[in-house]
Amino acid sequence: GWMRYRNSRQVTGVVKNVTVSQSSGKWYISIQTESEVSTPVHPSASMVGLDAGVAKLATLSDGTVFEPVNSLQKNQKKLARLQRQLSRKVKFSNNWQKQKCKIQRLHSRIANIRRDYLHKVTTTVSKNHAMIVIEDLKVSNMSKSAAGTVSQPGRNVRAKSGLNRPILDQGWYEMRRQLEYKQLWSGGQVLAVPPAYTSQRCACCGHTAKENRLSQSKFRCQVCGYTANADVNGARNILAAGHAVLACGEMVQSGRPLKQEPTEMIQATA
Protein backbone atom coordinates (compact mmCIF):
# COMPACT_ATOMS: atom_id res chain seq x y z
CA GLY A 1 0.00 0.00 0.00
CA TRP A 2 0.86 3.67 0.12
CA MET A 3 3.27 5.08 2.68
CA ARG A 4 4.67 8.50 3.52
CA TYR A 5 8.32 9.50 3.19
CA ARG A 6 10.34 12.66 3.77
CA ASN A 7 10.93 14.33 0.41
CA SER A 8 14.42 15.71 1.04
CA ARG A 9 14.83 16.84 -2.59
CA GLN A 10 12.53 17.70 -5.46
CA VAL A 11 12.23 14.76 -7.83
CA THR A 12 12.91 15.91 -11.40
CA GLY A 13 12.95 13.99 -14.67
CA VAL A 14 11.46 10.63 -15.55
CA VAL A 15 11.45 8.13 -12.69
CA LYS A 16 13.31 4.97 -13.73
CA ASN A 17 13.29 2.91 -10.56
CA VAL A 18 12.69 3.17 -6.83
CA THR A 19 14.62 1.18 -4.22
CA VAL A 20 13.56 0.79 -0.59
CA SER A 21 16.26 -0.31 1.85
CA GLN A 22 16.82 -0.64 5.58
CA SER A 23 19.96 0.30 7.52
CA SER A 24 20.44 0.31 11.31
CA GLY A 25 16.71 0.23 11.94
CA LYS A 26 15.94 3.09 9.54
CA TRP A 27 14.20 2.85 6.18
CA TYR A 28 15.42 4.69 3.09
CA ILE A 29 14.05 5.22 -0.39
CA SER A 30 16.31 5.89 -3.38
CA ILE A 31 14.69 7.33 -6.50
CA GLN A 32 16.59 7.15 -9.79
CA THR A 33 15.47 9.51 -12.55
CA GLU A 34 16.57 10.35 -16.07
CA SER A 35 16.56 13.84 -17.58
CA GLU A 36 18.14 15.65 -20.53
CA VAL A 37 21.11 17.82 -19.56
CA SER A 38 23.51 19.91 -21.61
CA THR A 39 27.19 18.96 -21.77
CA PRO A 40 28.78 20.56 -18.70
CA VAL A 41 31.82 22.82 -18.97
CA HIS A 42 34.05 23.03 -15.92
CA PRO A 43 34.47 26.60 -14.62
CA SER A 44 38.16 26.02 -13.86
CA ALA A 45 41.07 25.21 -16.15
CA SER A 46 43.56 24.05 -13.52
CA MET A 47 45.13 20.62 -13.08
CA VAL A 48 46.16 19.29 -9.68
CA GLY A 49 47.78 16.20 -8.23
CA LEU A 50 46.26 14.54 -5.15
CA ASP A 51 48.20 12.34 -2.74
CA ALA A 52 46.01 10.25 -0.43
CA GLY A 53 47.45 9.29 2.93
CA VAL A 54 46.81 8.24 6.51
CA ALA A 55 48.41 11.07 8.50
CA LYS A 56 46.81 13.50 6.03
CA LEU A 57 43.67 12.44 4.20
CA ALA A 58 44.64 14.29 1.02
CA THR A 59 47.47 16.61 0.02
CA LEU A 60 47.30 18.59 -3.22
CA SER A 61 50.25 19.60 -5.38
CA ASP A 62 49.47 23.27 -4.69
CA GLY A 63 50.11 22.70 -0.97
CA THR A 64 46.50 22.37 0.17
CA VAL A 65 46.11 19.81 2.97
CA PHE A 66 42.93 18.07 4.17
CA GLU A 67 43.21 16.59 7.65
CA PRO A 68 41.68 13.15 8.33
CA VAL A 69 38.45 12.85 10.27
CA ASN A 70 39.33 9.39 11.71
CA SER A 71 35.74 8.58 12.65
CA LEU A 72 36.50 4.92 13.45
CA GLN A 73 39.55 5.72 15.56
CA LYS A 74 37.63 8.27 17.63
CA ASN A 75 34.86 5.76 18.35
CA GLN A 76 37.07 2.68 18.75
CA LYS A 77 36.89 2.52 22.56
CA LYS A 78 33.12 2.95 22.60
CA LEU A 79 32.71 0.29 19.92
CA ALA A 80 34.92 -2.15 21.85
CA ARG A 81 32.91 -1.55 25.03
CA LEU A 82 29.61 -2.22 23.27
CA GLN A 83 31.00 -5.41 21.72
CA ARG A 84 32.20 -6.66 25.11
CA GLN A 85 28.73 -6.05 26.52
CA LEU A 86 27.25 -7.99 23.59
CA SER A 87 29.51 -10.98 24.27
CA ARG A 88 28.15 -11.25 27.82
CA LYS A 89 24.52 -11.53 26.75
CA VAL A 90 22.59 -14.65 25.77
CA LYS A 91 22.69 -14.96 22.01
CA PHE A 92 19.43 -14.04 20.22
CA SER A 93 17.78 -12.88 23.47
CA ASN A 94 15.93 -9.55 23.58
CA ASN A 95 18.82 -7.86 25.38
CA TRP A 96 21.26 -9.32 22.84
CA GLN A 97 19.14 -7.93 19.97
CA LYS A 98 19.00 -4.47 21.61
CA GLN A 99 22.75 -4.44 22.16
CA LYS A 100 23.35 -5.51 18.57
CA CYS A 101 21.20 -2.59 17.36
CA LYS A 102 23.34 -0.20 19.42
CA ILE A 103 26.47 -1.50 17.69
CA GLN A 104 24.84 -1.21 14.27
CA ARG A 105 23.81 2.38 14.96
CA LEU A 106 27.35 3.27 16.02
CA HIS A 107 28.79 1.67 12.87
CA SER A 108 26.27 3.65 10.82
CA ARG A 109 27.24 6.88 12.60
CA ILE A 110 30.94 6.22 11.96
CA ALA A 111 30.27 5.63 8.26
CA ASN A 112 28.03 8.71 7.98
CA ILE A 113 30.66 10.97 9.56
CA ARG A 114 33.30 9.66 7.16
CA ARG A 115 31.03 9.96 4.11
CA ASP A 116 29.91 13.49 4.99
CA TYR A 117 33.50 14.70 5.42
CA LEU A 118 34.58 13.05 2.16
CA HIS A 119 31.74 14.84 0.36
CA LYS A 120 32.97 18.18 1.69
CA VAL A 121 36.56 17.45 0.64
CA THR A 122 35.75 16.10 -2.82
CA THR A 123 33.31 18.93 -3.55
CA THR A 124 35.98 21.51 -2.71
CA VAL A 125 38.59 19.81 -4.90
CA SER A 126 36.16 19.17 -7.77
CA LYS A 127 34.89 22.76 -7.87
CA ASN A 128 38.37 24.26 -8.06
CA HIS A 129 40.15 21.93 -10.50
CA ALA A 130 39.12 20.72 -13.96
CA MET A 131 41.50 17.76 -13.93
CA ILE A 132 42.47 15.79 -10.84
CA VAL A 133 45.38 13.35 -11.02
CA ILE A 134 45.31 10.57 -8.41
CA GLU A 135 47.22 7.38 -7.72
CA ASP A 136 45.67 4.18 -9.02
CA LEU A 137 45.68 2.59 -5.57
CA LYS A 138 44.47 -0.99 -5.07
CA VAL A 139 42.98 -0.45 -1.62
CA SER A 140 41.75 -4.04 -1.29
CA ASN A 141 45.28 -5.36 -1.85
CA MET A 142 46.84 -2.79 0.46
CA SER A 143 44.51 -3.70 3.31
CA LYS A 144 44.72 -7.50 3.02
CA SER A 145 45.35 -9.48 6.18
CA ALA A 146 48.95 -10.52 6.85
CA ALA A 147 47.95 -13.51 9.00
CA GLY A 148 48.79 -16.03 6.27
CA THR A 149 47.94 -19.71 6.66
CA VAL A 150 48.77 -22.50 9.10
CA SER A 151 51.56 -23.80 6.86
CA GLN A 152 52.79 -20.33 5.91
CA PRO A 153 52.10 -17.93 8.79
CA GLY A 154 52.41 -14.23 8.11
CA ARG A 155 54.99 -11.84 9.51
CA ASN A 156 54.46 -8.60 11.42
CA VAL A 157 50.76 -9.41 11.65
CA ARG A 158 50.06 -6.94 14.46
CA ALA A 159 51.84 -4.08 12.67
CA LYS A 160 50.05 -4.82 9.38
CA SER A 161 46.69 -4.96 11.16
CA GLY A 162 47.44 -1.62 12.80
CA LEU A 163 48.09 -0.11 9.36
CA ASN A 164 45.06 -1.71 7.69
CA ARG A 165 42.62 -0.11 10.12
CA PRO A 166 43.60 3.56 9.46
CA ILE A 167 43.78 2.90 5.70
CA LEU A 168 40.17 1.70 5.69
CA ASP A 169 39.20 4.50 8.10
CA GLN A 170 40.20 7.14 5.53
CA GLY A 171 37.87 5.84 2.81
CA TRP A 172 40.23 6.22 -0.17
CA TYR A 173 37.99 4.18 -2.48
CA GLU A 174 34.94 6.29 -1.57
CA MET A 175 36.93 9.49 -2.07
CA ARG A 176 37.94 8.34 -5.56
CA ARG A 177 34.36 7.33 -6.39
CA GLN A 178 33.03 10.73 -5.34
CA LEU A 179 35.70 12.60 -7.31
CA GLU A 180 34.89 10.59 -10.42
CA TYR A 181 31.16 11.23 -10.52
CA LYS A 182 31.46 14.87 -9.40
CA GLN A 183 33.98 15.57 -12.15
CA LEU A 184 31.72 13.80 -14.64
CA TRP A 185 28.78 15.98 -13.60
CA SER A 186 30.80 19.23 -13.69
CA GLY A 187 32.66 18.60 -16.95
CA GLY A 188 36.01 17.79 -15.34
CA GLN A 189 38.14 14.65 -15.49
CA VAL A 190 39.96 12.28 -13.14
CA LEU A 191 43.22 10.68 -14.27
CA ALA A 192 44.68 7.72 -12.36
CA VAL A 193 48.43 7.10 -12.66
CA PRO A 194 50.68 4.29 -11.35
CA PRO A 195 51.67 4.95 -7.72
CA ALA A 196 55.15 3.42 -7.91
CA TYR A 197 57.93 5.52 -6.31
CA THR A 198 55.90 8.73 -6.08
CA SER A 199 56.93 9.02 -2.41
CA GLN A 200 60.65 8.45 -3.12
CA ARG A 201 61.11 10.50 -6.31
CA CYS A 202 62.36 14.08 -6.15
CA ALA A 203 59.85 16.42 -7.76
CA CYS A 204 62.72 18.77 -8.70
CA CYS A 205 65.41 16.59 -10.32
CA GLY A 206 63.70 13.20 -10.57
CA HIS A 207 66.22 11.28 -8.43
CA THR A 208 64.53 8.25 -6.86
CA ALA A 209 65.79 6.66 -3.65
CA LYS A 210 64.24 5.53 -0.38
CA GLU A 211 66.85 7.63 1.45
CA ASN A 212 65.12 10.77 0.12
CA ARG A 213 62.25 10.13 2.52
CA LEU A 214 63.72 11.21 5.85
CA SER A 215 60.51 10.65 7.82
CA GLN A 216 56.74 10.51 7.49
CA SER A 217 56.59 14.24 6.76
CA LYS A 218 60.09 15.26 5.61
CA PHE A 219 61.60 14.85 2.14
CA ARG A 220 65.13 15.80 1.15
CA CYS A 221 66.72 14.83 -2.16
CA GLN A 222 70.16 13.26 -1.66
CA VAL A 223 71.34 14.61 -5.04
CA CYS A 224 70.04 18.16 -5.52
CA GLY A 225 69.19 18.97 -1.90
CA TYR A 226 65.55 19.82 -2.64
CA THR A 227 63.50 19.82 0.57
CA ALA A 228 59.73 19.78 0.93
CA ASN A 229 56.88 18.22 2.83
CA ALA A 230 56.85 14.56 1.82
CA ASP A 231 53.15 14.55 0.95
CA VAL A 232 53.40 17.73 -1.14
CA ASN A 233 56.40 16.26 -2.98
CA GLY A 234 54.39 13.09 -3.66
CA ALA A 235 51.43 15.11 -4.96
CA ARG A 236 53.75 17.01 -7.32
CA ASN A 237 55.13 13.71 -8.62
CA ILE A 238 51.58 12.51 -9.20
CA LEU A 239 50.82 15.71 -11.12
CA ALA A 240 53.99 15.27 -13.21
CA ALA A 241 52.95 11.69 -14.00
CA GLY A 242 49.59 13.02 -15.17
CA HIS A 243 51.29 15.53 -17.47
CA ALA A 244 53.42 12.69 -18.88
CA VAL A 245 50.33 10.60 -19.64
CA LEU A 246 48.68 13.53 -21.43
CA ALA A 247 51.88 14.28 -23.37
CA CYS A 248 51.87 10.69 -24.67
CA GLY A 249 48.33 11.19 -25.95
CA GLU A 250 46.86 8.40 -23.83
CA MET A 251 43.15 8.41 -23.08
CA VAL A 252 42.20 10.19 -19.88
CA GLN A 253 40.33 7.83 -17.62
CA SER A 254 40.20 6.91 -14.00
CA GLY A 255 40.60 3.19 -14.50
CA ARG A 256 36.98 2.09 -14.05
CA PRO A 257 33.90 2.56 -16.25
CA LEU A 258 31.54 5.44 -15.60
CA LYS A 259 27.86 5.28 -16.47
CA GLN A 260 27.15 7.97 -19.06
CA GLU A 261 23.39 7.95 -18.61
CA PRO A 262 22.44 11.16 -16.72
CA THR A 263 20.93 10.10 -13.44
CA GLU A 264 20.00 11.59 -10.14
CA MET A 265 20.05 9.62 -6.91
CA ILE A 266 17.69 10.96 -4.28
CA GLN A 267 17.66 9.41 -0.83
CA ALA A 268 15.18 10.31 1.83
CA THR A 269 14.38 8.95 5.24
CA ALA A 270 11.05 7.20 5.35
Give each language-model segment a name.
Residues 4-15, 19-270:
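Positively charged, helix-rich recognition surfaces that bind polyanionic ligands
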